[in-house]
Regions:
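Positively charged, small/polar-rich N-terminal and surface patches that mediate targeting and assembly
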Residues: 1-86
């Protein structure tokens, strides 16, 4: 991917509040030009060999390939999940 190429980054978060917090920080630091927050989604996943269902929120961040690594690092640093879906 070329450094100036635009990309969308999909991030699940525990709730709308966490999504707003992350969105504000990444836009403030200019790691994303824009953030769209969907306040409620239903996630279905396999955890420890059991199917789990959980309410979450999702962020869609608009950024560039050049900013992606810094964006990902910041999200990992401030996200409440041990291994966030980015």
């Amino acid at each position: 991917m070329e450094k100036n190429q635009n990309c969308l980054v999909y991030v699940t978060v525990k709730d709308e509040g966490e999504g707003l917090s992350i969105a504000q920080k990444v836009v403030e630091k200019r790691l994303a030009a824009c953030a769209n927050l969907h306040p409620q989604i239903k996630s279905i996943f396999n955890y420890q060999n059991q199917i789990q269902t959980q309410d979450e929120a999702v962020l869609i961040l608009k950024t560039t390939a050049q900013a992606y690594d810094k964006l990902e690092s910041l999200i990992v640093e401030i996200h409440s999940y041990d291994d966030p879906c980015i």
